[in-house]
Amino acid sequence: MPNDNRLAPAALAAQAAALPAAWRHVLEQPAVARAFASVLGHVEQRLAEGAVVYPATPFRALDQLAPADVRVVILGQDPYHGPGQAQGLAFSVPDDCKCPPSLRNIFNEIAVDYPRPTRHDLSAWTRQGVLLLNTSLTVEDGQPGSHAKRGWETVTDALIAEVARDPSPKVFLLWGAHAQAKQALVPADAGHLVLAANHPSPLSARRPPVPFVGCGHFRQTNAWLQQRGQKPVDWSGEQNNASRQGEFAL
């Protein structure tokens, strides 16, 4: 049986209210509050009508990280729309789920320079300051993009802008046109690094202008962070294995 990752009625509002203050104040900005109220109304209406909505924890990407804790931002589009998949972290699925094609290509790219990840759950990245944020935080079963343009983009744009305003150095990994459209939210003089490539989906990963395959983003991210006195990210997700830490430095 797949994990039960269905959103429960009233859970979205409760989770928003429980967010850390650094994120909650973003949702309280007037324009963002109006957009979130619109999203919330639509989600609750669809749940009342019997729709299955994923994931159970839409705000999970924000739970363990304040804006100042974020070192890398990876943007997705909307959650996986199959049962048991979406976890509230972009690209991540439970370990017992089959590895989705885009995540497989991400792992292939990591394996060029580092040990290949063995876990499909990317929580270990989050614990190292990697924000895995979808631009739409809910989706209906079997209907990709079903909650896009319902107000989520206003909410997540404000969250991205809040991260970009924080002065600590950050890397923004923008894969595909949808993510790259968010580059305008990252001021050019903010001292952050923006790396862009095609989406890791098999449909686009090898296409020009900047193929995802061979982009070297994970190596470049670590090199840039280390140049600024920060620890590299253990992209293998096995940061507790001290004997392998040196493999993630350049």
Swiss-Prot record:
GO process annotations (BP): base-excision repair, AP site formation via deaminated base removal
SMART domains, per the entry: UDG (SM00986), UreE_C (SM00987)
Protein name: Uracil-DNA glycosylase
Function of the protein: Excises uracil residues from the DNA which can arise as a result of misincorporation of dUMP residues by DNA polymerase or due to deamination of cytosine.
Record's keyword annotation contains Hydrolase: yes
Subcellular location per the Swiss-Prot or TrEMBL entry: Cytoplasm
Leading EC class: hydrolase
Keywords: Cytoplasm, DNA damage, DNA repair, Hydrolase
Gene3D superfamilies assigned to the protein according to its UniProt record, in alphabetical order: Uracil-DNA glycosylase-like domain
Keyword Hydrolase carried by entry: yes
Pfam families xref list: UDG
Catalytic activity from the UniProt record: Hydrolyzes single-stranded DNA or mismatched double-stranded DNA and polynucleotides, releasing free uracil
EC number per UniProt: 3.2.2.27
Primary location group: cytoplasm
